[in-house]
Amino acid sequence: MNIHFLYGTETGTSEMLCEDIRDDLDLQCEITSMGDFDASTLDGDTFYIFVTSTYGTGDLPMTAQPFYDAIASNKPDLSHVNFAVFGLGDMVFADTFAFGSKILMELLVDRGAKMVGERGIHDASSADMPEDIAVPWAAGILDIHRAAAA
């Protein structure tokens, strides 16, 4: 199974979290900023795990916005794409908590992509480190995806 992490970040936390998941689960995978990834190349042979923070008033980080905009404007059929989403947010901003991952997830599903499992979320105001939530979440998501692919 090909695994590709695509992240959106302002401060580097999402990228580091992808690396933590890869290392802790001993995955052979790619890790790429959404800002450096051509949305038209999403393929059905790869399982995509999106990790993104929320910026400003519930927006995607600047590194993820071009990816989002390309899908929103081109409206591709993504029915061949399987993905999961993990969002980083802060409940101090309860009205827009983890909205970056939410709006990305909604767009992908709207274009026909198949989401595996539930969206994972980390609250920066909690005592938990992001990797303490994301690593077990990712392990569960990968188990679900492997079982469905078998």
Model features per residue range: what roles?
Residues 4, 12-16, 24, 28, ...:
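FMN-binding flavodoxin-like domain, especially the glycine-rich phosphate-binding loop
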Residues 26-40:
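A short, well-structured beta->alpha microelement
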